[in-house]
Curated annotation (Swiss-Prot):
It is a single-pass membrane protein. This is Uncharacterized membrane protein YoyG. Its main location: membrane. GO terms for cellular component: membrane.
Amino acid sequence: MYGYSGYGYGFGCGTNTFVLIVVLFILLIIVGAAFIC
């Protein structure tokens, strides 16, 4: 997508893990808010 041939997908320390952590953090906040409310 961005011109990287294998850097974005071949390595786990790229942006994919960062996006995954952000998504999990947002889901955790949503679930926590749902249980609190």
